[in-house]
């Protein structure tokens, strides 16, 4: 008999909303959002899926702003080497997984999205905001993967990962 595991949303990322600038005449606001990442049913073979991370920034008035940012992800319940989803009902069980930044499925294990520690990477970039121009949008691909291995107890598994955005 096959065991089917239905992982829930892997990454429930807390979105950060920041208002920064050098004063009331030089300000901008940004919204960070993540699409849902659902890996489907796990039956022992590696599975992966992807979602989009989107950063939208709007100029608040005044002159021009040069914006540099970093988006870092927490390890969730596990650690960066191997994140872990917990079963949401009894009996307790876990399911290993990880999150990757802009990686292709064949090279997932080389781009773990974290906070820059322990060999992990974070999403970074820069752009200019000009007074009166349209908002600036930047996107990154968030990959999630469950490695091949024994299937745990059937059920819903989830983890909560916190996203932190830094403006430099």
Region annotations inferred by a language model:
Residues 72-76, 98-102, 112-116:
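Predominantly extracellular/luminal cell-surface or secreted proteins
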Residues 22-24:
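N-terminal signal peptide c-region/cleavage motif recognized by signal peptidases
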Residues 2-14:
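Bacterial N-terminal signal peptides that target proteins for export
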Residues 104-133:
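Extended, solvent-exposed segments with strong compositional bias
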Residues 44, 102-104:
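Residues that form or immediately flank small-molecule/cofactor binding pockets and catalytic motifs
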Residues 26-96, 128-168:
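N-terminal small/polar-rich segments of proteins
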